[in-house]
């Protein structure tokens, strides 16, 4: 006998007492009899176990039960953590990603027609970046002077200091 026909509900109808379907992305947990398993699991974790296997009962002992699998972690109220919810579409389909931005190079070239900087300006600035001494060298003499591209010395040049008479009289005491 069909359970839906026995209750008198249609295929899309749910009663208010039913749990939400798995399609909603949430998992329901049965907490009956889990307190003793939880206590045993806590005791095992306190004794040095790294995890509790999911497919082996919590009362199993020995190192093999720790190595075979991992338990599904749950919050104190028994619900799954947020990162353990049922899987859904993680990224948009490729068709949608392709439609986000359409690039029209012809339109970009037309937009650049009024650009005050043309290729000659760009090439001139690149050649100065590659050979910075070209702008500093005198036109008739191509001898390179290393001081053109070095910072000034760290020791400042001081002029001769002149002291006034009586300026440091109190310092002698």
UniProtKB/Swiss-Prot annotation:
It comes from Mus musculus (Mouse). Signal peptide: none annotated. The modification Phosphoserine is found at residues 64-65. One of its GO terms (cellular component) is nucleus. GO terms for biological process: blastocyst hatching; chromatin remodeling; muscle organ development. InterPro entries: COPR5. It holds the Pfam family COPR5. Keywords: Acetylation, Chromatin regulator, Myogenesis, Nucleus, Phosphoprotein, Transcription, Transcription regulation. It is found in: Nucleus. The modification N-acetylmethionine is found at residue 1. Interacts with PRMT5. Interacts with histone H4; specifically interacts with the N-terminus of histone H4 but not with histone H3. Interacts with CBFB. Found in a complex with PRMT5, RUNX1 and CBFB. This is Coordinator of PRMT5 and differentiation stimulator. Residues 1-70 are annotated as: Disordered. Transmembrane segments: none annotated. Histone-binding protein required for histone H4 methyltransferase activity of PRMT5. Specifically required for histone H4 'Arg-3' methylation mediated by PRMT5, but not histone H3 'Arg-8' methylation, suggesting that it modulates the substrate specificity of PRMT5. Specifically interacts with the N-terminus of histone H4 but not with histone H3, suggesting that it acts by promoting the association between histone H4 and PRMT5. Involved in CCNE1 promoter repression. GO terms for molecular function: histone binding.
């Amino acid at each position: 006998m069909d359970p839906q026909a026995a209750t008198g509900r249609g295929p899309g109808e749910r009663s208010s007492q039913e749990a939400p379907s798995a399609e909603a992305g949430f998992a329901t947990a049965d907490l009956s009899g889990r307190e003793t398993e939880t206590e045993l699991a806590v005791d095992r974790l306190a004794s040095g176990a790294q995890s509790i296997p999911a497919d082996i009962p919590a009362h199993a002992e020995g190192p093999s039960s720790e190595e075979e699998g991992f338990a599904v972690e749950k919050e104190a109220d028994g619900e799954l953590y947020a990162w353990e919810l049922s899987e859904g579409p993680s990224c948009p389909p490729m068709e949608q990603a392709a439609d986000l931005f359409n690039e029209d190079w012809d339109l970009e070239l037309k937009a650049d027609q009024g650009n005050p900087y043309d290729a000659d300006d760009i090439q001139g600035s690149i050649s100065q970046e590659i050979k910075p001494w070209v702008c500093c060298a005198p036109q008739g003499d191509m001898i390179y002077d290393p001081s053109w591209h070095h910072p000034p010395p760290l020791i400042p040049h001081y002029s001769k200091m002149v002291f006034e008479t009586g300026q440091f009289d109190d310092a002698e005491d």
